Amino acid sequence: VLFRSWLTQVPEDFRFVVKLYGGFTGQAKWQDSYPSMTAMQEHFLETLQPMIESGKLFCFLAQFPAQFKCTKENVAYLETLRELFNDLPVAIELRDYSWYGKEFIEKTRQLMRTLNFSLVMVDEPQLPDTVPLDTTVTNPNFSLFRFHGRNQAYWNDRTGDWRKKRTLYRYNEAELKILGE
């Protein structure tokens, strides 16, 4: 496995953030590759066991798509996800505003605390279809901050090599100072 060699090539105190396979977050159909969700989980964790055992895993990142709205079904799915990953560190990136609206933000934070997830702190352009920067710590053991940049010009542009342009952004000193506080 490719990543096994990484474990010996990084400094002793280096830790990896591993993005979950899209089957866990609805960005791929796990049914196309696995007979059950449990089989998917077992294969995923078995593959990453050397990283987990070495202590090089910082956390798993579950980046949910914007279609993952704040619904009872999706809350139940997050509970299932916690069961699948037991006590392993998992950071949850929610990309739909419904989780952050006035009606649900406190419930979202409490859900993350209850399930022992870290709600990812995301800095991205502030547009009608993006999520606000929420720096609330929901897991006292670890937090994850993702700097997507503030490139408003290309954020919603889905033409050409849009993925490369979308996050093409260099923070200035003033922005970094504010984010560092």
Regions found by a protein language model. Name each.
Residues 1-181:
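Residues lining hydrophobic/aromatic ligand-binding pockets adjacent to catalytic sites
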